[in-house]
A protein has these predicted regions:
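Expand to "…catalyze enediolate/carbanion chemistry for C-C bond making/breaking, isomerization
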Residues: 1-298
């Protein structure tokens, strides 16, 4: 499956690999995807047991919520064991942590292809989501995005106190002002690389839903199509922000009709509700409506 065939995902909720029973909470919250975490959320002594439980959960996956797994970094054998265990028909994608550059993506792509072949799955079925957690990875977002056709949902993740804050050295603030340029630059690289459905993150203050909404709205305004989340209470807010409202959809439908009527008269542009619009705006409107009809799981 090429990356441009991946469904849009508004919300991707992390679930500890030691707590696979929490998948029910993720589904109840309305998450478009759950990310079972085998990396940071699992102590070293529990990696093996968590891997088995996550693999079983992937094998049982059903319903509308996509299942992703964040594996361990490629610099250790656990990553290989993770991929072999979790690559099953129910796996939508893999989050690849600590990506250093395109070579890591190429290696992960080859490993996934081998695992898919081993399981009798079509090559490229499993999406690959590189996590840009170093200054070098952030600077190389374009090359990383082009490193494998299965790359999807790529974006800047600038949570408070995380790897990116340490790597870049900025001081986090609720306004997101200090990461605005960074998120914008990564988004431009991702779009230029042809990677659809860019996903941002991460809001770590569980109880501050107003702050979450403001951050999500800022990311949507930049051009991101979804966000990673760490708590079920964040999912409804994120889903709302990254979904077009009925009023927006109705306006887009009217805009398309107005442009079509103008074109039938031989006009290239037309005044619509006080604005000058043309085919470029109509194409954008058609894309939004198509995405809304397609839904998060296609």
């Amino acid at each position: 499956m090429s990356s441009d065939a991946r469904p849009p995902l508004r919300s991707m909720l992390f679930v500890p690999g030691t707590k696979v029973e929490w998948l029910a909470k993720a589904a109840a919250a309305g998450a478009d995807a759950a990310v079972l975490d085998l990396e940071d959320a699992v102590p070293a002594a529990e990696k093996g047991a968590a891997r088995e439980r996550v693999a079983e959960a992937v094998a049982r996956a059903s319903g509308d919520m996509a299942i992703f797994v964040r594996i361990n970094p490629l610099d250790g054998w656990p990553a290989v064991e993770d991929l072999r265990a979790v690559t099953r028909p129910g796996l939508a994608g893999v989050l690849l942590p600590k990506v250093g550059g395109p070579a890591d993506v190429v290696l992960a792509d080859r490993m996934l292809t081998w695992c898919e072949r081993e399981r009798g799955l079509p090559a490229g079925q499993v999406a690959l989501v590189p996590l840009l957690e170093s200054a070098a990875a952030l600077r190389g977002a374009y090359e990383i995005g082009r490193a494998a056709p299965r790359v999807a949902y790529l974006g800047a993740v600038t949570g408070r106190g995380g790897d990116v804050e340490r790597a870049v050295g900025y001081r986090w603030s609720p306004s997101g002002r200090e990461t605005l340029e960074l998120r914008s630059r990564v988004l431009l690289d991702v779009r230029a690389a042809g990677v659809p459905c860019p996903v941002a993150g991460l809001w770590t203050t569980v109880g501050d839903l107003d702050g979450l909404r403001a951050f999500a709205e800022q990311n949507r305004a930049l051009g991101y199509e979804g966000m990673l989340a760490i708590h079920p209470s964040h999912v409804p807010v994120i889903n709302e922000v990254f979904s077009p409202s009925p009023e927006e959809l109705a306006r887009y439908a009217r805009l398309i009709a107005a442009v079509k009527e103008a074109q039938a008269r031989g006009a290239g542009a037309v005044t619509f509700e006080g604005e000058m619009v043309d085919e470029a705006m109509a194409a954008r409107a058609r894309g939004v409506i198509a995405g809304a009809c397609r839904g998060p799981r296609g």
